[in-house]
Amino acid sequence: MSEPIDLSQIAPTLKAEILAEALPYIRRYHGKTVVIKYGGNAMTEERLKQGFARDVILLKLVGINPVIVHGGGPQIDHALKKIGKAGTFIQGMRVTDEETMEVVEWVLGGEVQQDIVMLINHFGGHAVGLTGKDGGLIHARKLLMPDRDNPGQYIDIGQVGEVEAINPAVVKALQDDAFIPVISPIGFGEDGLSYNINADLVAGKLATVLNAEKLLMMTNIPGVMDKDGNLLTDLSAREIDALFEDGTISGGMLPKISSALDAAKSGVKSVHIVDGRIEHSVLLEILTEQPFGTMIRSH
């Protein structure tokens, strides 16, 4: 990846052109909600973390309402390693026993979330951290993982949940008070248990419930790639099904693309997978006409 651009070296006239290009997009998204799934390198490299914080602050300042749903897989793996426990995944989902769930809760709801909140606040924004347990935000139920090798059978992967319902009242209240919500993907079940929910799934469901104008999912790759490593810039539901069938989309990309497609089918107007390794990727996708990442379409 190329070295980051030194903005101080950009000529004033070019800066003005950049701002002028952003104006129609600011008008389009003014007053609208944009849900951002935040994860990957953008959460671990200091330069990218600071760039992301500034991006969401700018969106809020120009009247766009960002809602952040964050992951934290590498941080969870690191914490598990410290206690001598290895992470196990099935079909892109983390197997979560009781001990792992305790680690997930304090890593996501504590360390990772607070790092994001503090960074946004440090640069002049007003962020508030939530888990799905706060304000009854995310009602969850145990996820039954279909066993692909044994049709009709299911695999028990522990305290892994799926979204049963979302109560967006607390998120809307924060938006109305000019705050930026930062949400950890932990839900609560009627059985009294906490559930680890894939952050991509939470972001997609939340975008649908909030009637978001855009869902943006950040990854460590340029977007959805074909088997030859070429970027696929535009994918329909039929094309995605074919990529599932031939194994092009697999592992951790399975829940991401499934969630993106579900959101598109449920009325989210614009769904994009973007490369979070690119500095200011959020602003590039939302406020410029530059084609970026992969657009997911429902038809």
Curated annotation (Swiss-Prot):
The keyword Cytoplasm applies. It is an enzyme of class 2 (transferase). Gene3D superfamilies: Acetylglutamate kinase-like (3.40.1160.10). Its main location: cytoplasm. This is Acetylglutamate kinase. It is found in: Cytoplasm. It catalyses: N-acetyl-L-glutamate + ATP = N-acetyl-L-glutamyl 5-phosphate + ADP. Substrate binds at residues 72-73, 94, 196. Catalyzes the ATP-dependent phosphorylation of N-acetyl-L-glutamate. HAMAP family: ArgB (MF_00082). Keywords: Amino-acid biosynthesis, Arginine biosynthesis, ATP-binding, Cytoplasm, Kinase, Nucleotide-binding, Transferase. GO terms for molecular function: acetylglutamate kinase activity; ATP binding. GO terms for biological process: arginine biosynthetic process via ornithine; L-arginine biosynthetic process. The record marks 37, 256 as: Transition state stabilizer. Pathway: Amino-acid biosynthesis; L-arginine biosynthesis; N(2)-acetyl-L-ornithine from L-glutamate: step 2/4. Belongs to the acetylglutamate kinase family. ArgB subfamily. Its EC number is 2.7.2.8.
